[in-house]
Structure formats: C-alpha cells, structure tokens
Amino acid sequence: MSIDDLKSKIPDFAKDVRLNLSSMASDETLTPQQKYGLFVACGIASRNADVRKALVAEAAAKVDASVIQAAKSAASIMGMNNVYYRFVHLATNKDYRTMPAKLRMNVIGNPGVDKIDFELWSLAVSAINGCGMCIDAHEDVLRKANVTSETIQTAVRFASIIQSVAIALEAADTE
C-alpha cells in the first residue's frame, strides 16, 4: 500500500485530512531521516494497519533499514513509557514520582541513529499517546540540542495528520 492508496481510501467527509496528508507527503522541511522516521513511528502509533503499512512502505523506499528499525523502536518504547509516565503524571498520589520505574529503556540512549532524530520521533509518538510528561522531557532534550520550534512543531503536525488519517479510515469503516 502507498500513500496514494491511503489518500484514495479517505472519504469526502475527511477531505481536509486527505489534503493534509498530501501536504505532509510533499513537505521537505525535515531531513529525509526525520521525515520518514516520523512516518514509521507515528504510523505504528496510530494503531491502524493500513496507515502503518502505507507509511512504512513509503519510508522503506526512501531511507536505510536502520532508520526503519529505530523508528519502530521509538514507537515501541514510547508505547510503554507513555502509559507509565502518563500514570505517574496524572495520579493524585505523588509517591509514584519518587519510585524507580524499573523499566528497560536502553534504546533511548543508543537508538542506532542520530539521537536527536530519535527524540523527535519519540516526542511525536508521545503527542499521539497524550503523555504530557514525556512530551516535556523530549521537547527539553530537543531544545537543548538547538532544534528549532518549527522543526518540533512540524513533527507534531505530522503526528496529528497521521492520527487523523487513522481516525478518518476508522470512521469510513462504519458506513
């Protein structure tokens, strides 16, 4: 499945989503590794098979397999961290904030690609998963590495578009 196939599946009630997907696909403001890593990580985080397949296929044609693997790692590790740290952040019992997480997350320190790109993907997945604590942590690392607000905003915009594509396809499935 390709992005064009994905666009063709988006119904007219979600025309804005389809147009945003087209804009995202042609956007060249990020490096190819940043862009296609976002496609993979956010496609997986969307939990929609069609979205995941189309975006992974698009990325596989554009970047090295190590980028695909690292983006898969970002989606996977954020799937764990976003649940845990969202709980820690939202729980009224603040004792959880001082307890060790006891979760392996070595991939964050050694993702196999540029660490800043991995942080950007992790931020975008954290936005999809709604973990404010993780969003703040990843945004802080990115800002300290002099990543611009525009780059960060673009990553989150891509995440929002990818998530909206998944939702539009789910909504179309109800017709």
From Swiss-Prot:
Q: Name one Pfam family in it.
A: CMD
Q: What EC number(s) would the UniProt record show?
A: 1.11.1.28
- Covalent S-S links between cysteines: 131-134
Question: Which GO terms of type biological process are on file?
Answer: cell redox homeostasis; response to oxidative stress
Residue positions of the active site:
131 (proton donor), 134 (cysteine sulfenic acid (-soh) intermediate)
**Which EC class is the enzyme in?**
oxidoreductase
- Could you list this entry's UniProt keywords, alphabetically sorted: Antioxidant, Disulfide bond, Oxidoreductase, Peroxidase, Redox-active center
What does the record give as the reaction this protein catalyses?
N(6)-[(R)-dihydrolipoyl]-L-lysyl-[lipoyl-carrier protein] + a hydroperoxide = N(6)-[(R)-lipoyl]-L-lysyl-[lipoyl-carrier protein] + an alcohol + H2O
The chain's coiled-coil residues are none
Highest taxon of the lineage? Bacteria
The entry lists its GO molecular-function terms as: alkyl hydroperoxide reductase activity; disulfide oxidoreductase activity; hydroperoxide reductase activity; peroxiredoxin activity
PANTHER family the UniProt entry points to: ALKYL HYDROPEROXIDE REDUCTASE AHPD (PTHR33930:SF7)
Family per similarity comment: Belongs to the AhpD family.
Query: What NCBIfam families does this protein map onto?
Result: ahpD, ahpD_dom
Role, per record: Antioxidant protein with alkyl hydroperoxidase activity. Required for the reduction of the AhpC active site cysteine residues and for the regeneration of the AhpC enzyme activity.
Q: What protein does this entry describe?
A: Alkyl hydroperoxide reductase AhpD
Q: Which species does the entry assign this protein to? A: Brucella anthropi (strain ATCC 49188 / DSM 6882 / CCUG 24695 / JCM 21032 / LMG 3331 / NBRC 15819 / NCTC 12168 / Alc 37) (Ochrobactrum anthropi)
Q: Which gene encodes it?
A: ahpD
